[in-house]
Amino acid sequence: LIDADNIEYESANKTTIFTPNFEVPEVVRGESNSTYSDIYAFGILSYLAITIAHPFKGIGLEEAGWDSEETNKKEQWELPWIEDSNDDSNRSNNGLKGPLTITQDLYKLFRKLFENGKEDKYKRPTLPTWIEFLEKAASSTILCHGCGMSYYEELFPNCPYCKKAKPTRLIVESYYYKNEQKQQKRWKFVKEINEDIKSIELPSYIFKTFNILETDDIFLEIKFINKSRVELSFNKNDEEVYFESQTAMRSLKKGLSLNKLENGISIITKSDIATFVEIKIEK
C-alpha cells in the first residue's frame, strides 16, 4: 500500500520520480523523499480504497481543465483535498464518504495528513498510528447477509445499503481497567454470527496493548460446540486472566452455556496494561 517510488528514509534522492495520482508535495518539488513521503502516499491510497474517491480529484480540478484560460492553473496535488475543513474549492460529491466509510478517528488522521501535514511532513501521522485506527475501523464493521456490503454496526439500525435487518452478532467492547473499575473504552470488535459458524477468534489487541507486529495474533477463540454450549479457549502467555473469579485462571479453556454468552460475560486481563472486556451476543 506504499508507493515504492518513495521508499527512502532521510537520505537524499535527487531524481524526481513519482506515480501519477499519488504525488507527494516534497517529491514533486524535487526534494528528498523519506518515510514521511511514504505516509502521504499511503494516506492517498487509503482514502481511495475506503471511499472509492481520490482525495484530490474535485471540482477544482474540473474547473481548471485543459481548456481553462488560467495561466496559473494548479496541479492536482497542489489543490486542497476534497474534504478540507477550511477550503471547499475542491469539494467532491463522488465516492462513499461520511459515516458510511470513515470513522471520526480516521477523519482526524486524514485532516492531519492532508491539511497540517501537506507542507509540514513532520506533522503527518505515523504509519503505526494509521494501522491501529484502520484496524479499529475494520473491526467495528459487520457484513450484511443481504447485499454483502459492510457497515459500522453501532451507527446504523439496519443495513444502510439494502435496509436488511442486522444479523445476530458477537459484540466485544474493551475498556481500560484501573482501581477495580472499567475506565475509558479502548476498542470495539463486532462479528456477525450465522447458523453454520464454528468459532470466532478475538485478536490480542482487544485484551492487550496494540502492537503492529501482532495484529494477527489470537488471544481468545470462542468455539460454538453445539446450539447450547460454547467453549472459551485462551492463547495466553504471561498474562493474568480473570473470569468470574478473583483468582487468575489456570486452565486455558472454559465451557459455558450459550445463554450465558447471550446475557453477557466479562473478562479482566492484566499484562502490560489491565483491560476489562465485555462479550455478548445481540440479535
What are these regions (language model features)?
Residues 10-33:
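Conserved activation segment of eukaryotic-like protein kinases, specifically the C-terminal portion
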Residues 56, 98-102, 106-127:
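A conserved short helix/loop substructure at the end of the activation segment
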Residues 194-272, 277:
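Forkhead-associated
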